[in-house]
Amino acid sequence: GALMADDRGVDVTGFCPIHLGMVLKKMELMGIDCERTDDGVHVSRAERIKPVDIQTLPFPGFPTDMQAQIMVLSALADGSSVITENIFENRFMFASELVRMGADIRIESHHAMIHGVKGFSGAQVTSPDLRGGAALVVAGLIADGTTEVSAIHHIKRGYEQFVEKLQALGAHVEHATVPDPVIY
């Protein structure tokens, strides 16, 4: 979300770009500028996101762990994309929550057919898992209105200082504490 609003782009460091070669290739096909450095990549937003078809595969193929984030981008593309999940079953559980935000996604077996929309609307959504939950937060950052993501224990377990890192990029995100439910 912060990246979508910032013309300067963002530096993502601390990794070898070769290890994410297929992800960067697909992002470039979507119109996103990915300038590789020795220890990461400088990513700049696209004027228009282009649709792309993706199949998850073992390394060096497209990693299943990045499928949810790419689905968020694909849901905003100018056209239709297909994501085929070849590694895990039930990996599209977050897609129904993304639809609640205005995405146009149809799931058939291990395929997600995604038709790009102009934008997302804020909504109350539930994180079904680690990767899907993070993708919902990203979608919420670029949505019109407020998005509340519940069941964030998945995200907290898997991403260290997730909220703080997004805030450092300029994102308007906070971890809200909700009271324990009262059982009658």
Annotate each predicted stretch with a short phrase.
Residues G1-Y184:
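Short, structured segments at the rim of ligand-binding sites
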